[in-house]
């Protein structure tokens, strides 16, 4: 299903260690042809008209007498694209973004033989908020819609996975924060995932979260719910159309306190919330060797607290940028649609082609002149740029984006 690996064979398995190698090599073409080759607002693709390794992971799972651990490297574009979306390293010292940038997953723990299993792990683990996996080999699309792309892909903390039956998983989290290496304030993030699969063709995934995730504002509380249903409605390996399935995800959340209100706000305490959905349908053909997915989603996010900061003049989530304010009272609405074609000659490889259209109500995506000042980034990240002669440089942002991508994913 969407967000889950289709692997059934593990050639690198042994008694103590199960190895994994995964690579995502991608070529993307932005129709706006940005001169600085920078893609804005995507967690899947960072560069235009170039072949790039977005993610290279080497590692696997250690398992011995109940003790367990997992390590997966984070090499390639993700090692810079993912850490810059976390503002927490801006608090204090030791450069947490550099300390963790090459780790996709890194945790250790213990497995208890309780009911159908109980795992306690500590470290960095994938969140699966927003349904889609961090590894695009496991997804039906490459460019996931906003309720996935703009929600956490990893957590740093402790998780407890309890399986009371072979159909139910309950997974509480005690974490540093909302996709953060460190804490934003003095309260840890608290959350839980409940995954229920009553039948082989039906799955429910419910994620709930509460935390204080605005750096320097200890009075503001974030609440978020992310809920999905997946349905496989057709299965016939002997027919041309061998399988059919769909997924629907709905997200609702808000921030309250510290100058914001969940709903019904005013000028002194504006409403600050997130609401969005995504829906995809996938067909498999020729005994599941060809896949075709269509779908998309939409979001509204007053306050822009879950909008990815555009990398204008090197801006990050910590620096922000005056060219795209993210503060109470600002507005952001967007929608997207994708068409994805996969060829999967074996369970270890996927050849993918995808067309994406995204639209926002304000200029956000990269236009032809890009988001990098002449001569490269200038001054501190995200600062205003003054050109020789005194003119103020402005980035080229537009309200729409159209993109083609082609990729090869390998998983062994």
Label each residue range with its predicted role.
Residues 1-38, 389, 407, 412:
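N-terminal periplasmic/intermembrane-space "pro-region" immediately following the signal or transit peptide
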Residues 4-19, 61, 65-70, 113-118, ...:
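Short loop/turn motifs that connect adjacent beta-strands in outer-membrane beta-barrel proteins
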Residues 12-16, 51-53, 187:
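Short, surface-exposed loop/turn motifs at beta-strand boundaries within globular domains
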Residues 21, 53-62, 105-110, 122, ...:
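Residues on the lipid-exposed face of transmembrane beta-strands in outer-membrane beta-barrel proteins
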Residues 25-33, 55-57, 64-68, 75-79, ...:
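Transmembrane beta-strands of outer-membrane beta-barrel pores
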Residues 30-48, 80-107, 111-196, 203-212, ...:
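Surface-exposed coil loops of outer-membrane beta-barrel proteins
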Residues 45, 82, 91-96, 202-210, ...:
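Outer-membrane beta-barrel pore domains
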Residues 57-78, 83, 161-171, 228-233, ...:
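Surface-exposed extracellular loop regions of Gram-negative outer-membrane beta-barrel proteins
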